[in-house]
A protein has these predicted regions:
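HAD-like aspartate-dependent phosphatase fold
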Residues: 1-104
Length: 104
């Protein structure tokens, strides 16, 4: 839950383990950089953010990239020591919608 008193970039989370569901292009790396530049580039602050995710948390990436880019994508993440549990390729281009319960 966003905590307005602590600033717009602060989120209060429970002490339970977390599942981070992150879009890849335009959120973590330059949008379509893998196509236009031929390689991925982190957006400012993204690499540091990813390294701050606690070890026991689950990390899922969603992307509209086709599976033909899977090896290059996973190589980039591995070279930068980005830990993840799953990458879902070929997601629709529209919004990502997450529905979750509120923790007490």
């Amino acid at each position: 839950m966003l905590n307005e008193e602590k600033g717009r970039n602060h989120i209060d989370l429970s002490s339970l383990g977390h599942t981070w569901i992150l879009d890849l292009d335009g959120t973590i790396v330059k949008h379509n950089g893998y196509k236009t530049d031929g390689y991925d580039t982190f957006l400012p602050g993204a690499e540091k953010f990813l390294q701050s995710i606690p070890e026991g948390d689950m990390v899922l990436f969603l992307t509209s990239r086709t599976k033909e880019y899977a090896k290059a994508t996973e190589r980039f993440l591995c070279e930068h020591k980005v830990r993840y549990d799953l990458i879902v390729y070929e997601a629709p281009y529209g919004e990502r919608v997450l529905v979750n319960d509120a923790k007490p």
